[in-house]
Amino acid sequence: DIRYLWLSSFGLVLHWYGDSLDGTLARFRNTQRPIYGFFIDHTLDALTTCLICLGLGLSPMMRMDVAFLILAGYLCLSIYTYVCTIIINEFRLTYGKLGPTEVRLLLIAVNTLYIYTPWSAIHYNIYGRNWGLFDIIGCTVAAILFMLYISQFTKDRRALALKDPAKPWHP
């Protein structure tokens, strides 16, 4: 039922507030737990993203393979963030101009477009497979996620290679 998309958009807003306010509330109460909070926050973020992508793939909105492609792009950026946190002590949540807030707003906008536009009925036969317009939008989102990952990796790889140069090998 298409009306559940409003419920999912509400769930995204609820998640947004919970994700944003938990650390603020802990700091206000002076009960912050930086290590445990980081652990819980980011493992639950990964689980939430898996559930969102699974929901997309199980719905008529998007093919499962496209939803998993988006998930793979998101997880690559997440893993990259955690590696950079350890190696260069920089916790980066925004890539390009795309951060968690923009992603949530984009998901809410896509839900709204799916409800109010006839775009959900638009389908294309590409290489013998049926692709809906939202599948194509999903592939575009996945491509953007992977391009952000590759461009940031390339930039950081150069800087880290200079910071930690190869050592000569003497057998």
Model-derived segments and spans:
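Hydrophobic alpha-helical transmembrane segments
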Residues: 1-5, 9, 52-171
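Basic, amphipathic juxtamembrane/active-site segments
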Residues: 12, 23-65
